[in-house]
């Protein structure tokens, strides 16, 4: 049985309906609660049940982001970022940095069901301190991509295999201003992706081999955490 609690929202799941109902009864006898039945919407995430699994999406939340940014009717883009990021563009300051940060912060929450925008959101996050007009143009491109993929999300398949797998990669000195590298990884439980990240490395690597080892170390740490968090699961789990 698993219990997810956020402020006054509770999500319960488990393999025994008897235990779930018992816990709900015990909680209800102590606290004022309302049982909403099978989950359909939780913390901005829409959950649709299918015979073969669950589909998680944030379509309504994405629409809200676009509306707040004044880009609900914008022209969609097929990719979140250009092929090459140009660091030598105009450095004119964006007049409303708080607006820039608000949009980027909202996009960070959208990555909960959208691993495809993790890298792009990481790039614009790095420019929140003193955003320029060019940075805002880059942010608008991410929003245009969200517009064109607004119904995308995560499909969680039913799967009896609980082996953990991970994939990682990194560039080398991809950030032209700091010469720091970026690591990306994703981990899977069976055939389902369960965690992902795109993050600039904290220090400069002196070779591509060094940056790859840093990426591997970060991924290994994620695997260790994932395995530890499931240590109480009775099912056998292999780590590859």
Swiss-Prot record:
Q: Which residues form a coiled coil?
A: none
In terms of Pfam families, this protein maps to:
RVT_2
Task: Give the source's domain of life in one word.
Answer: Eukaryota
Q: Does the keyword Mitochondrion apply?
A: yes
Where, per UniProt, does this protein localize? Mitochondrion
For this UniProt record, the keywords arranged alphabetically read as follows: Mitochondrion
Kindly state one GO CC term assigned in the UniProt record: mitochondrion
Asked if the Swiss-Prot or TrEMBL record annotates the protein with the keyword Mitochondrion, the reply is yes
General remark:
A stretch of 270 kb of the mitochondrial genome is duplicated within the centromere of chromosome 2 resulting in the duplication of the gene. The expression of this duplicated gene (At2g07683) is not demonstrated.
The record ties this protein, via PANTHER family, to: GAG-POL-RELATED RETROTRANSPOSON, RNA-DIRECTED DNA POLYMERASE, PROTEIN KINASE RLK-PELLE-DLSV FAMILY
Stated name of the protein: Uncharacterized mitochondrial protein AtMg00810
């Amino acid at each position: 049985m698993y219990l997810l609690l956020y402020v006054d929202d509770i999500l319960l799941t488990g393999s025994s309906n008897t235990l779930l109902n018992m816990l709900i009864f015990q909680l209800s006898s102590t606290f004022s609660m309302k049982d909403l039945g099978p989950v359909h919407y939780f913390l901005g995430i829409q959950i649709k049940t299918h015979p073969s699994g669950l589909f998680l999406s944030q379509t309504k939340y994405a629409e809200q982001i676009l509306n707040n940014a004044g880009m609900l009717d914008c022209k969609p883009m097929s990719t979140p970022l250009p092929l090459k990021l140009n660091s030598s563009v105009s450095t004119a300051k964006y007049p409303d940095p708080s607006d820039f940060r608000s949009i980027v912060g909202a996009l960070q929450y959208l990555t909960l069901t959208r691993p495809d925008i993790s890298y792009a959101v990481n790039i614009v996050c790095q420019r929140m301190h003193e955003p320029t007009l060019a940075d805002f143009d880059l942010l608008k491109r991410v929003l245009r991509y969200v517009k064109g993929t607004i119904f995308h999300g995560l499909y969680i398949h039913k799967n009896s295999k609980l082996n953990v797998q991970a994939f990682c990669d990194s560039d080398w000195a991809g950030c032209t201003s700091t010469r720091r590298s970026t690591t990306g990884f994703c981990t899977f439980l069976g055939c389902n992706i369960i965690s992902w990240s795109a993050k600039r490395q904290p220090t400069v690597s002196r070779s591509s081999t060094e940056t790859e080892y840093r990426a591997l170390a970060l991924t290994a740490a994620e695997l260790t955490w994932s395995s530890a968090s499931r240590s109480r699961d009775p099912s056998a789990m292999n780590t590859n």
